[in-house]
Amino acid sequence: HFLRMISGDKSVKYTGEFKLGARVNPGYFAQTHSHPEFMGKTLLELLWENYSLQLGPAKSVLRRYEIDQQAEQKFSSLSGGQQARFQVLLLELSGSTMLLLDEPTDNLDLASAESLEHALGRYEGTVVSVTHDRWFTRGFTRYLIFGANGKVYESPEPIFEH
């Protein structure tokens, strides 16, 4: 619920308060890659419809996420890792300055998870992730622990190291 809460999801119930910086624009990456609105459309079609990107600029942004070779493929035919990278790209194009990733490597094979991690490494904003993937956390610099009492603590290392 934490990620949905800070993404602005009004259906999440919580007590207390939080405030994001004035220039923080959160973008939520759901645990599932279910996007019925993407079905039947190629990556180029989606980039044109949502961001008016013509062929050259569209291929350029797809190349940054190592999915330019899939430009003409339908979203549904992409691997899990390719779908994840495309979704991160869309969040970036939407102006998100803080990515909220809910189990981003869940159901990805190792190669797909590595590709996603590589793409996130090039992202210039803040990345907040909820994950149970020990491998994925190795590049993180800060860890938050959610206690049973509802309090949030910062830790110098991931909790599964304790």
Predicted feature locations:
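ABC ATP-binding cassette signature C-motif
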Residues: 1-162
